């Protein structure tokens, strides 16, 4: 079973209050020590009991820590709030870090181009050579990767263009096949029109031919009658 929650209030029993004070004081001193060691912090702890007894802990010195606190407090009151002081401190630290980074970059660039190799030892030169070889290997690997990607893209693009070309050719063939019947109908209409223009229709000639020419069976019927009228009757 876990412990129940302890209500935070003044302990009325004197003995219990003294026992609790000793336990909590020792725990507080232990935490202050751990904080100073683990985090490299300057810690000063001052505790007065209810009877006026002093208990203190400091990883450096309580007096020096208090003096530092007074100075920081006075500087803060003169220069501004704590947030402003922290901001100034961080700006200074960042400026120092930027300068260090810039100097390291300049040193590396001089090393790469070979400007500062005259002052290097054999061991340093071997280290620089190994770094350069690793860098060149990474550059070549990245270069080959980009080239392969570009070749793959061009191959896909070629296939797409070929498919588009085949599609356009099929459309052209379909259009040509659809226009062939229309061309044949247009040619027939043109020949009929030319025949009508070259041989115009004349209704008078048509009537003359019909009037002057009698049907052959009708002329055959009239011929015996004409012969009978021109002959004398024979008397026996």
UniProtKB/Swiss-Prot annotation:
Major localization listed first in the record, in broad terms: nucleus
Record carries keyword DNA-binding: yes
One GO cellular component, as annotated: nucleus
GO molecular function, one term: protein dimerization activity
Alphabetized SUPFAM superfamilies for the sequence: SRF-like
Effect of loss of the gene: Homeotic transformation of stamens into lodicules, and ectopic development of lodicules where they do not form in the wild-type.
Domain K-box: 87-178
Domain MADS-box: from-to ranges: 1-61
Keywords assigned by UniProt, alphabetized: Activator, Developmental protein, Differentiation, DNA-binding, Flowering, Nucleus, Transcription, Transcription regulation
Localization per Swiss-Prot or TrEMBL: Nucleus
Keyword match Translocase: no
UniProt tissue specificity: Expressed in lemmas, paleas and lodicules.
InterPro entries reported for this sequence: MADS-box/MEF2_TF, MEF2-like_N, TF_Kbox, TF_MADSbox, TF_MADSbox_sf
Example GO BP: positive regulation of transcription by RNA polymerase II
Function: Probable transcription factor involved in the development of floral organs. Acts as C-class protein in association with MADS58. Involved in the control of lodicule number (whorl 2), stamen specification (whorl 3) and floral meristem determinacy (whorl 4), but not in the regulation of carpel morphogenesis. Plays a more predominant role in controlling lodicule development and in specifying stamen identity than MADS58.
Further details from the record: The transformation of lodicules into stamens is observed in overexpressing plants.
Protein name: MADS-box transcription factor 3
Protein source organism: Oryza sativa subsp. japonica
């Amino acid at each position: 079973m876990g412990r129940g929650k302890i209500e935070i209030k003044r302990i009325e029993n004197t003995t219990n209050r003294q026992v609790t004070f000793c336990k909590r004081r020792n725990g507080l001193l232990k935490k202050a020590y751990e904080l100073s060691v683990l985090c490299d912090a300057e810690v000063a702890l001052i505790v007065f009991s209810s009877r006026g007894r002093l208990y203190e802990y400091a990883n450096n010195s309580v007096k020096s820590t208090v003096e530092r606190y007074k100075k920081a407090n006075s500087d803060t009151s003169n220069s501004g709030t704590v947030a402003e002081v922290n901001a100034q401190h961080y700006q200074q630290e960042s400026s120092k870090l930027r300068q260090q980074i810039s100097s390291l970059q300049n040193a590396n660039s001089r090393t790469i181009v070979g400007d500062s190799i005259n002052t290097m030892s054999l061991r340093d030169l071997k280290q620089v050579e190994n770094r350069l070889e690793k860098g060149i290997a990474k550059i070549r690997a990245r270069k080959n990767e980009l080239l392969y990607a570009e070749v793959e893209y061009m191959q896909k693009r070629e296939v797409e263009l070929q498919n588009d070309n085949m599609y356009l050719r099929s459309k052209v063939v379909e259009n040509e096949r659809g226009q062939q019947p229309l061309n044949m109908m247009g040619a027939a209409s043109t020949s009929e029109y030319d025949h009508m223009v070259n041989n115009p229709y004349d209704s008078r000639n048509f009537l003359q031919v019909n009037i002057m020419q009698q049907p052959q069976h009708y002329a055959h019927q009239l011929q015996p009658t004409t012969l009978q009228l021109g002959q004398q009757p024979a008397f026996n």
